[in-house]
A protein has these predicted regions:
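Bacterial Sec signal peptide processing site at the extreme N-terminus
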Residues: 11-34
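A structured, mid-to-C-terminal "fold-capping" secondary-structure block
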Residues: 18-26, 136, 140-255
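Short, surface-exposed glycine/acidic/tryptophan-bearing loops
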Residues: 49, 70-79
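Active-site flanking loop/helix segments enriched in acidic
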Residues: 61-73
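Post-signal-peptide N-terminal segment of Sec-exported extracytoplasmic proteins
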Residues: 28-63
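Non-catalytic, solvent-exposed segments at the cell envelope interface
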Residues: 50, 54-58, 66, 92, ...
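Bacterial N-terminal signal peptides
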Residues: 2-14
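Mid-length scaffold segments of soluble, non-membrane domains
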Residues: 76-159
Length: 255
């Protein structure tokens, strides 16, 4: 964790360099908007040309017999590999209960769920995943949110969460315990699971990215409100994957 302090300090200093504004009832700190919009344009093109087609192929691997399809297996395996890192973060936050739940979920799915391809922990033992990350750990430690960022390929974030993504890679037990090739394979599987998520919520993601009057502002609004609610730091809960018609998507610039 030797990098945590300088990273967190950088977030604090950078987050104090601009004055947030109120937009649609929430505080928005976006001093890098022009650069963020350029990255957003790249991300939209990348999603349209690469991610969405892959997601559609993954989705096509499903079946109608109630059995898990390729999409479900990929999502399950990727989510299972993320659990050791969540255990570490819960412990760093001083929250032993979710750490224990995620540990047992990982143990059950790895042993009884064919290495995590299946989810007996959730379906048979009532052990749902308790989601967390190092961005939340920084929030628990009192590090401010910082400015809004859109990251290449990864999408919406903040300075605090961006720093958290870097540290999550550094502290993840999976990458320390596995051989280099196996660790890269695990990373690829987790990335593929994101394509599975994209397939599962494809219509709604398309409505936000392709049908919004201002998809950058719309995505920023959804992310900030959802993330702050998730961290109990204010903001109304918005499920970015809730079923909604394109006409119902909020345009934050609509008077």
């Amino acid at each position: 964790l030797s990098l945590v302090v300088p990273l967190a300090l950088g977030v604090i200093l950078a987050g104090c360099t601009s004055e947030p504004v109120m937009q649609d009832g929430i505080r928005v700190n976006d001093p890098f908007e022009s650069g963020n919009r350029r990255i957003h344009a790249f991300n939209k093109g990348f999603d349209q040309r690469v991610v969405a087609p892959v997601a559609r192929r993954v989705s096509a691997g499903g079946n109608e017999a109630g059995e898990p399809g390729a999409m479900d297996l990929v999502i399950n395996a990727g989510a299972n590999l993320s659990l050791p890192g969540k255990v570490v973060n819960s412990l760093l936050q001083g929250r032993p209960e979710p750490a224990i739940r995620n540990f047992f979920r990982f143990a059950v799915n790895t042993t009884l769920g064919m290495g995590g391809l299946l989810d007996p922990a959730g379906t048979d033992f009532g052990l749902p995943e308790v989601d967390t990350d190092f961005g939340e750990t920084l929030a628990v430690w009192g590090v401010p949110e910082g400015a809004y960022l859109e990251l290449p390929v990864l999408g919406p974030s903040t300075q605090r969460d961006a720093a958290g993504k870097v540290v999550d890679l550094l502290i993840d037990p999976v990458y320390h315990l596995l051989h280099r090739d196996a660790a890269w394979a695990a990373f690829g599987l987790r990335a593929a699971s994101k394509a599975g998520d994209r397939a599962r919520f494809g219509d709604t993601v398309d409505s936000v990215l392709q049908d919004s009057a201002d998809s950058y502002a719309q995505l920023r609004l959804i992310y900030l409100m959802h993330r702050r609610h998730e961290l109990n730091q204010g903001g109304t809960e918005i499920d970015p994957y809730a079923d909604a018609a394109a006409d119902d998507v909020i345009d934050p610039y609509d008077p």
